[in-house]
């Protein structure tokens, strides 16, 4: 490896680093790029298809983006915002597919109807109100609603088969939903980066980040095969290491990370590959979260397409582990505690009793209780058809709050040094689905003097970047149809 400073170092071989690298390579093709990945392959943590649900998060079915207010009203603003962000990701992927820089789209994205399914009178009323708010929104065009069991049975037979006919049920369906294999997408993006001159350093664990007197970043890494140390200098560093990002940003010494902590939540899914069952369900069906449950724990029964094979997934079942990564250590959480963040972390523990109660309940749940949750969606589920698999770790952001002392923040947050020389990403859902708008915002924040010059290229890749679609019905319809045609998705 050369001793010359590297223009861009990406730490972590997941979807975020791959997306940022793909953008930088196109807006500034002469820059050198190196990716450090501690494991032997990229996309093995949160981006691995079995470590996430693979939902193309566009708020078509996820109720947590449109909660019911105390007065019974539902505000579509958050759902519209999430959908707008996903459209930017779709445009970026479509541009790379059209240019031949990504493989056949079916290798990483497939049409899968997105449904919401609820039970009980009050939940039915809520879903009806949600539908009324969304049905005329351009980005939600084509959404269907039904309280009729026979209609719902046509959409997703497993939901109604042998269900008590007296139970009030309702569902929405949006045929334009997607299932995304973020592992395959990450690998394809990284392959394209390497083919264009980027360097991929696998089995390299970054141990420290230090600022030099001349404004560069000194990166010390260890080759995990042979334990040999490596050093490099970088002009810009992105820490896209998933749950490992907090530790590395803390080691960098930037003041912007002070007061931030991480709350790790583990997950499990039930999975079946039984062809007779899989053939009866082609949808991602989301329900309503339990009281206190974090957003990524909304129960859902999903069609998954991974490596061309179709299966069904149900969950997630949340749990607690102090590990920040699936391959992390039991010291991850205690090792992240600092004088500057212990106050916010204690405040979060004090104010989130419902979450703690929920997690304890999930930890205590045995297989029969997990199957009972599945049978609320699929009454005919049999234990012998389903296996329990471990999903990835999610580290929720805890941060200072002037009023409460500390708050638990769901979603993602970009932490960047004031001079823009280093940035990292904390948090979870909707995460990968909105990687493209997150990285566009990061470029604008970290390279303000260059961003205007990059905009023409970004607009070629993402035509509506910097604008919105939902308030322009004709443009929304055009973009949805164009990206669907390129990505071979339902329109």
UniProtKB/Swiss-Prot annotation:
Protein's GO biological process: tricarboxylic acid cycle
SUPFAM superfamilies linked to this entry: FAD/NAD(P)-binding domain (SSF51905)
InterPro entries in the cross-refs: FAD/NAD-bd_sf, MQO
Sorted UniProt keywords: FAD, Flavoprotein, Oxidoreductase, Tricarboxylic acid cycle
Family: Belongs to the MQO family.
Disulfide links within the chain: none
Top-rank taxon, per record: Bacteria
Pathway assignment: Carbohydrate metabolism; tricarboxylic acid cycle; oxaloacetate from (S)-malate (quinone route): step 1/1
Gene3D superfamilies: D-Amino Acid Oxidase, subunit A, domain 2 (3.30.9.10), FAD/NAD(P)-binding domain (3.50.50.60)
Species for this entry: Leifsonia xyli subsp. xyli (strain CTCB07)
EC number, as in UniProt: 1.1.5.4
One matching Pfam family: Mqo
Keyword Oxidoreductase: yes
NCBIfam families: mal_quin_oxido, PRK05257.1-1, PRK05257.1-4, PRK05257.2-1, PRK05257.2-5, PRK05257.3-1, PRK05257.3-2, PRK05257.3-3
Cofactor(s) annotated in UniProt: FAD
Name under which the protein is recorded: Probable malate:quinone oxidoreductase
